[in-house]
Each structure stands twice: as C-alpha cells, then as structure tokens.
Amino acid sequence: KWIISYGDQYTQTAYYICSVGNKVLLNPIGTVDWRGLAAQPYFLKDLMAKFGVKMQLVKVGKYKSAPEMYTEDKMSEPNREQVSAYINGIWDEMVKAVSESRKISTTELNRIADSGITFADSKEYLKTKMVDELVYTGDIKNRIKKQLGIKEDETINQLSVSEMLKAPAEENTADEKIAVYYAYGDIVDEVAAGFNNETCIVGSVVTKDLEELANDDDIKAVVLRVNSGGGSAYASEQMWNAVNELKKKKPVVVSMGGMAASGGYYMSCGANYIFAEPTTITGSIGIFGMIPDMSGLITDKLGVKFDEVKTN
C-alpha cells in the first residue's frame, strides 16, 4: 500500500516516522525540525545547599549517574561518556533510517542538521529532498482522491488513529493463548497511598500476576513487555524470581521498549528470550542508596535541637 505523509510542521520525531511515506508533503509555510539530539541534565546540589540540605550517597558502579543531580554540579566524565554514546547511537539510527527512506546520504543529513534548516525557507526542504512537494492542507484530499481514482465530489472513507484505537479487539476463542503482560514505569515495592499502579511496576502485584499466568493452563506462553528505568532492588529481585518460576512451566519472551535498565533489565533476564530495539537503553550499571542530611536545615537554620535517652 502507498503512504502519503503530510504536515504543517514536522517535529524531528514526526519527520523520522513520516519519512517512510511514498511521498512526504509539507505546507508551503511549514517547517521541518532536523537539528540532531542533545541531553541537558540539571543539578540541584547548590540549590539544596542554600537550604542546608545535602545527600549522603553510597553507590556501586562509576556509570550509575542517577544520583548526580543531587550530589554534583556538572556531569561526571563516565556519565558524559555514556550519555554521549547513547544520544549518538540514537541519532545514527535515525539518520540511517531516514537515509534509506529518502535516499539522502547520511553525510548530507548530518550536514543539513548542522546548517540550521529548521528555520529555513520551506523551499530549502525541497532543495535538500527532505520533502517532495509543498502543498496546502485543502489540496491534500483531492490528491488522495486522485491517487485512489475517485472523483473530486466523492467522499473518502476516513478513519482517524483515535477511532482505530476505539475499535473492539477481535475476540480470541482459541483454547491455547499467548498472554501479553505490560510492565511500565518505576519499580516499587508497594503502591503509595493516593497513587495507582498503572504508572508504576508494583513488585507484589507483578509477582502475583505472573504466578496466576503460570497456573493458567490455557496460557501456553507469556510475552512480557518491559519499559522501565528500574527502582526498588527488592521488588526487582522478587519479579526476577517470579519470571524464573514462570519459565519452568511455559516459555517467557521479553520485549523491551525504550528502556529496560537496572531493575527493568534484572526482571527481564530470567526470560527464555529477550528482544530489544536498536535504541533501547538496557543493561545494569550498578546500584545506589541515598539519604538526605537535613541537619544543616533543621539544626543550623531553624534552630531545632535534639537530645537523647536510650537503653542500648
């Protein structure tokens, strides 16, 4: 089937997706954002110091950079190294894919990104072959009708993405089924009061669910979709064990999303098979524990004093 991509403005991500179209069309006053990737972490150490707060940190692994925002005022060299490797890896994948779709060399695509084309005249996008034509929104339907071979006064049977998502899934009446289990978010031991477990991976809930899947004779295999940067080491350990127990009864396949790192990788590594995307952040680079030292705020700034009587 043919695909026509059209946009008034293409963000970099949108252009990456739409570049696979047979034709990429742009509004005559539209823009294409194509300028490379950047990472810009922020650091709270000096801000906390103004309030008399500092972090006590214990960590294993020089690349475990998550606590740096609380303990440093700039990126450590190991963190700079890994972030650079990551964003360059993603950019290389994007450039390679667009190069194949648009028949533009990777060297040229990098030159275009360096040129600041995002704010260029729209005709520049034609010249660089990033788009095929400049077309007003009102003309798109007629172009599609022409492509379909129908008259201009006839209507097109259209279906939006939101309408497609509302369509009911076909009922599976087969006796043998493959379960797809989604594990998205931060890994926690228990869901906090006032929050729901749809935005995090609750270790106790996941282990119970995996146990039920293991005991369901209609389920012949399980696909575990993981998208998590990690969290509780205890919960990760329990889920890893649950995956191993599940694997004893039926095949377990992990499909990794944008991230399956630290505890997200830990819970995955017990599976029979693991599949990741070229841009997935995965692996484990260490652990850390961190406790805020509030003495500078409470004692020095607020004047709160403590005394103690104890038995041991």
What are these regions (language model features)?
Residues 125:
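Short, contiguous alpha-helical
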Residues 1-114, 119, 145-250, 259-312:
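Small-residue-centered hinge/linker elements
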